[in-house]
UniProtKB/Swiss-Prot annotation:
This is Protein SAR DEFICIENT 1. Transmembrane segments: none annotated. One of its GO terms (biological process) is plant-type hypersensitive response. Induction: Induced slowly by Pseudomonas syringae p.v. maculicola ES4326 and by microbe-associated molecular patterns (MAMPs) such as flg22 in both local and systemic leaves. GO terms for cellular component: nucleus. Transcription activator that binds DNA in a sequence-specific manner, 5'-GAAATTTTGG-3', to promote the expression of target genes. Recruited to the promoter of ICS1 and other defense-related genes (e.g. PR1 and SID2) in response to both biotic (e.g. Pseudomonas syringae pv. maculicola ES4326) and abiotic stresses (e.g. UV-B), thus triggering slow defense responses by stimulating salicylic acid (SA) biosynthesis. Required for basal and systemic acquired resistance to P.syringae pv. maculicola and Hyaloperonospora arabidopsidis. Pfam families: Calmod_bind_C, Calmod_bind_M, Calmodulin_bind. GO terms for molecular function: DNA-binding transcription factor activity; sequence-specific DNA binding. It comes from Arabidopsis thaliana (Mouse-ear cress). The lineage of its organism: Eukaryota, Viridiplantae, Streptophyta, Embryophyta, Tracheophyta.
């Protein structure tokens, strides 16, 4: 009421002052106007026209001035009463980094493929239990935030990303979780959109205390993950594997697109997997380059071959044997060790001899499969032993190898029981004991390559 009376008193004073000003101003205005329009406009007529207009303008200005002063006064009083900002005493952190790559619609997990966990800690990162639940909001953040190690709550809020127009919420799933006993678990959460449309082209996942959940006197700093790229789910169908697997389709290699020119050329020559690609690169690299054609530049070739070479070969080994030789090959046709005419070859120089390469090429071109074995614990060391030991081995063991004269050179055997550690029946060459190979049989599939 006091404010209203103040407004009325001010309004009355302003009106009186305005009226006096108008009366003093109007005669001076009337004189020149009257001289122009002559007898058409009298002083009284001019006053009756202008006076309401001027009154209205004065009233509006007075109202604006009073309301502005009232707002400033009330804002100042609020600032005085507001408590001072407190420094966070606790903070939230994500226990582990995220598993990448991340695709839209795919469940987000940590590096160990477990649900994301958020823990409450103090300044020294020691777990804290407040003995009461705290609700958290899970949000998406700009990947380039923050610029330093610290941030304010206002900065955190201003970097929360909302969905694009016409899109679903950017994060779907458990976007609200509860900290109990100092830990919160996000059971399932996914991104619904890729990160290519924002300035940093990356997202972070953030966690903040929901409004009204922390309680008086407790300030909790927000948590956020590392910056990650989120790709469209449809890209997962065409993504490259790092590292590739032997059985992966060949287009999983860099620079070879699915259903592209290189993929079609390779498929036409029965090179369908990463293993097929690697085997031919070992046996006849020139033929492989010829299949790919001039479109595969030297630079592209280096990238593709380097990617293929990242492949994990595993423990499987393959045995090729004939009347005067015994060879151990890895899954991509590289000779690990060979026994030829009583001499054990293990050095790289000896394994690169033309005769050995011809044996490898012959094994590769056969339509049957080689015997399959696995490395034993000592096999890796044996494959790298020196020539002196090789000579001793050849002298003491070669005479014990039985040879079936009717057995074809580089002959193959069909599937055998996994219990047979040494093939001795039917007069075949027995496996040299110190090669430490455990036989698991051979495949029964039929395709052009023997492995």
């Amino acid at each position: 009421m006091a404010g209203k009376r103040l407004f009325q008193d001010l309004d009355s004073d302003q009106e009186n002052k305005s009226e006096k000003r108008i009366k003093s101003v109007l005669p001076s205005l009337a004189s020149p106007i009257s001289s122009v329009f002559g007898a058409l406009i009298s002083e009284n007529t001019l006053r009756s026209v202008l006076e309401p207009v001027i009154r209205k303008v004065v009233r509006q200005e007075v109202e604006y001035g009073i309301s502005k002063r009232f707002r400033l006064s009330r804002s100042s009083s609020f600032r005085i009463e507001a408590p001072e900002a407190t420094t966070p005493t606790l903070k939230l952190i994500f226990r582990k980094n995220l598993m990448t790559p991340i695709f839209t619609g795919s469940k987000i997990s940590d590096v160990d493929n477990n649900p994301l966990e958020i823990i409450l800690v103090d300044d020294s990162n020691k777990p804290v239990n407040l003995n009461r639940p705290i609700k958290l909001d899970i949000v998406a953040l700009h990947g380039d935030f923050p610029s330093g190690d610290k941030w304010t709550s206002d900065e955190f809020e201003s970097n929360i990303i909302k969905e694009r127009d016409g899109k679903r919420p950017l994060l779907a799933g458990e976007v609200s979780v509860t900290v109990r006993n100092g830990v919160a678990t996000i059971g399932e959460i996914v991104f619904t959109d890729n990160s290519s449309w924002i300035r940093s082209r990356k997202f972070r996942i953030g966690a903040k205390v929901a409004k009204g959940s922390s309680g008086q006197g407790v300030v909790v700093c927000e948590a956020m993950t590392e910056a990650i790229v989120v790709r469209d789910h449809r890209g997962e169908l065409y993504k490259k594997h790092h590292p590739p697997m032997l059985e992966d389709e060949v287009w999983r290699l860099e620079k070879i697109g699915k259903d592209g020119a290189f993929h079609k050329k390779l498929s036409s020559r029965h090179i369908n997997t990463v293993q097929d690609f690697l085997k031919l690169s070992v046996v006849d690299v020139d033929e492989l380059r010829q299949i790919l054609g001039p479109g595969m530049s030297d630079r592209k070739w280096e990238v593709t071959l380097k990617h293929a070479r990242e492949c994990i070969l595993g423990n499987k080994l393959y045995i090729s044997r004939g009347p005067n030789f015994f060879m151990i090959l890895n899954p991509i046709c590289e000779v690990m060790k060979a026994l030829i005419d009583g001499h054990v070859l293990s050095s790289q120089e000896s394994l690169n001899q033309p005769y050995v390469k011809n044996l490898v090429r012959d094994a590769y071109s056969k339509g049957n499969f080689l015997e399959v074995g696995e490395r034993t614990a000592n096999e890796a060391a044996l494959l790298t032993q020196g020539d002196d030991l090789d000579q001793q081995y050849a002298a003491s063991h070669y005479q014990n190898i039985e040879i079936d004269k009717s057995y074809q050179q580089n002959g193959y055997v069909q599937e055998r029981s996994t219990n047979n550690l040494e093939i001795v029946n039917e007069g075949y060459i027995t496996t040299p004991a110190e090669f430490n190979i455990c036989f698991t049989g051979s495949s029964s599939q039929n395709h052009i390559n023997p492995f």
